């Protein structure tokens, strides 16, 4: 249920109490980014750091849709997974550095719990948006399986995660992101080898598989597909994920500890973001950026999925 309200007599409105809680903290942090980061990158940093997309105008969203980057600009499951991996690796490194900790809690268990706690904390910072909650539930299933030392295949873990998401929010099946996220993960697990350690080749393979595999579903859900999206994602995913987003998070964490300490990280993140954004704007304005497809029926979707699978 969504609604928009307004105040009839603004002059008569008065604040009864100062804002409190996580939402008030997020609002204050978002305002700090807007005030202390100059240039056009501030709205995007607010979205990447806090999931606050209110400052993005129609032109920005049009560019993101045309280049297939909408899934990266706001806090998504991918970002939550990145934070979870960071905490897991950090705790695992501490356990390797201090082997005595393993007598209290096995390293694998500690890393799994740290990943879950880090993902949950980041989801709260993001305002508990549905994509972040969905990813936290997936991570919780994986952590539970590891802590309980249960042997489960990837298919079983995905099925349990799907069940957990539906128990949390049954109406999520009406959201396109639900189908795209689970279909994308399932497609990658099915098509990609699990023992491929070549990072560049694995990234290119994952990008190709995700693009081809999700193309029929994307066209069916939205009636359009970004033809330049694969090329834009080849640059945006590694650059934004491993440079811009970490700097945004470092700045937010430092700013939460001491006001003013995170400005340098935000400004550096803005500079790094602006290195790539003009190119994406140009790419989104090309005549071949978007492919519009008439509405299709279920038979066409099934045929397209079979073709992608083949």
Model-derived features with residue positions:
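Active-site/binding-pocket entry motifs
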Residues: 11, 54-55, 120, 241, ...
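Alpha-helical transmembrane segments of multi-pass integral membrane proteins
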Residues: 185-288
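Membrane-interface helix/helix-cap signal primarily in integral membrane proteins
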Residues: 1-71
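Generic alpha-helical secondary structure signal
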Residues: 24, 28, 43, 55, ...
